[in-house]
C-alpha cells in the first residue's frame, strides 16, 4: 500500500496523517482518500486544542488549512514548527502568491490549492514521507524470513 513502508510492510503500521480542516465534507473526503491508500487518518475535532491534538497523536505528516476557527493555519504552522519538524502540507482555498510564500516562510513543506487533484495530493504526501522517513525505513531490510539490521550488520 502507498502509505506503508516497503520493507516488512506487513509488520509495520501505516503512516499517521493529521488533518486540520474545519469543513466536515472536505475533512471526510480526505479521511476516506487517505485510509483508502493505506494511511491512518486522524482529524482535529476541537480547534481550540490543535497543538494538544498534535502532541497526543504524534502524526508523521499534517494536512493544514489556512482559514480555521480560533486561529489561522499560519499560526498553527508556526506553533508546530517550533516543537517539531513534521512535514506540513497546506491544503487551502487561499490561492495568492503571498499565501504560498507565507506558508513556505513559516515552515510549510508543500502548498496545494482547493479544489485539489487527489493524485497530486497523494504524490506529494508520499514524496515527503519518503524523504523524511527514508533513513528509518532503510535501517532494516526484510526478505522472506530474514531481517538484516544495516546499522549493526546483524541478521
What is each model feature region?
Residues 15-16, 127-155:
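Short, Lys/Arg-enriched segments at the junction into DNA-binding effector domains
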Residues 2-132:
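N-terminal/domain-start alpha-helical segments
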